[in-house]
Amino acid sequence: MRPSAFLLRARPRNWGWLWLLGCWLALWAELELLTDSRNYYGPLWSPVLLYAAAVVMCGCAVAYWLDRPATSAGPAATLKRVPVAGLLLLLGGGWVLSVQAPAIATRPISLNYSDVIVILQTYVARFRSGEVVYRYLTNLAYPLFPNHLPLQWLPYVPADALGIDYRWWAMGLLLLLGFGAYQWQLARQPISWLEFGLKALLPTYLVVRLIQSNPDIYALTCEPTIICYYCLLAASVLGRSALLQATALVLCLMSRYSVVFWVPFFLWVLWREVGPKHALVVASLTGLGVLGVYVVPFLSHDWTIFTHALAEYRIATLGEWGGHAGENGLPVHLFGGTGVASWFYTYGPADINDRITVLQRTHLLASAGVVVLVAWLYYRLRAQLDYRLAALIGLKLYLATFYTFLQIPYLYLTSLTLFISVFVVMMVGFRRAPAVEPVVTAL
C-alpha cells in the first residue's frame, strides 16, 4: 500500500486526539533521549530511537492535519495575547539565564575546554581590525583553515565591541528573536489560554532541561545563535512575508549548509501554491543575501576558501574517529547516542577513511532521498494538507535525517532539531485546528 493511501485510511476522522497525543509523546521521547535517557539504550539503538521519535511526530502531525482547514486568526485575539506572550517570554528567559549562569561562570573561554569560541573570537578580531578573515589560524595547538561560514561569527561583532560574552549574546538572540518569532506565531493560534500558556513556556523548558542534563552544551559553544536562525525559518514558513522567508533562508544557509537540500523543495512549494512571483522574489532575495554576505566580501577574494573548508571538515572527522576515545576506547562523540555514525564505525570497512566515506555518501543519499519523499507525499496529499504545514513537517523530517547521519554527531548540533519539533507541536491544538496565516507576496 502506498504511504499516502495508508495515511488516509489509517486516520479515523474522530481520532485527532490520538495524533495530538502522538506528537506530544514524540516530543517527550526526543527530549528524554537527548537529556536524562541519552545513550540509555546504548550507542547503537539510542540514535535509532531518537530518529524514530522524529518520524512518529511527523507522521502524527500529517495525520492530524489531513482535511483540516487552516483557518485565519482573529486580529483582536492576537493583539490580546501579544503582551502576555511577551511577559511569558521574559519569564522564560529569566528561567533559562538563571540555569545557564552557573554553567558559564564555571567554564571560562579557554582552549582547555573547547576551541569553538576561541576560533569565533579570532574571526571577529580579524574582521574588526581589517585583516583577512579566511586564512590559517595560528593561535591553536594545530593548524586550521577557517571552515565557518560568515553568519556563524558575524553576529558576535557587536558583542565583541561591547565586551559581552559571546555565549550570553547567543542565548539572548535565541530568547529574543528565535523564541520571539515562536511566540508571535503562537499568539495567532485560536487555542485556549491554558494551552497558550503551556506552549508559550515549552521552548524555554526544553532549553532548561538540556542545560541541566549537560551544562557544557551551550556553555562551550554558541549554538543558540544557529537555533535562533532555524526558529526564524520555521516561523517564516508559516508567515506571509517573502522578505522574512528569504532572510531566514540566508541566515541558515550562511551559517551551515544543513538546510541546502530542503530549500529547492520549499521554493517549489511556494511556486505551486503561492505563485511564481512570490517564489522568484524569495529565491532572488536569498541569492542576493548569499552574494552580499559571503561571495562578494569573502569568497570572491579567494575561491579556494570553499574547498579548503571542506578539506578541514574531513580532517576534523578523521581526528574524531581516530581519537577522543572514552573509557571504553571508542570515540566519545560517535558513541554519544545522538547519531548513527556509531553503526558505520562498528560495522563499516576496516579502514577508517573508508568508513567515513561510506557514511558521507549515505548521508547525502538519505538527506536528498527524504526531500524527494517529502515532495512526493506533499504532491499526493496536496488536496488534503495545507502546504505551509507540509513544508514545516518536511523541514522537521529533513533536519532529523540530516543530523542523524552526521559524521560527528555532537549533542549541541543534534539539539537543534528539538526546537523545530516545538513548532510542529505548536500547530496541533487541543480544541480546533490552529491557524496558519494566509500567504501573499509581501516585502
Description of each model-found segment:
Residues M1-V99, L381-L397, V425-L443:
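Start-transfer (signal-anchor) and selected internal transmembrane alpha helices
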Residues L27-L33, H278-L395:
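Membrane-lumen/periplasm interface segments of specific transmembrane helices
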Residues V116-A141, T304-T307, A316-G319:
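Extracytosolic helix-loop segments that constitute the early lumenal/periplasmic catalytic or substrate-binding loops
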Residues W153-L154, G197-P224, L399-Q407:
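Aromatic- and kink-enriched transmembrane "portal" helix at the membrane-lumen/periplasm boundary
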Residues Y166-W193, V374-W376:
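Transmembrane-helix motifs of polytopic, lipid-linked glycan transferases
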Residues E223-S241:
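Specific aromatic-rich, kink-prone transmembrane helix
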Residues A234, L243-L267:
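Membrane-interface alpha helices of multi-pass inner-membrane proteins
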Residues W262-L288:
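Perimembrane helix-loop-helix junctions
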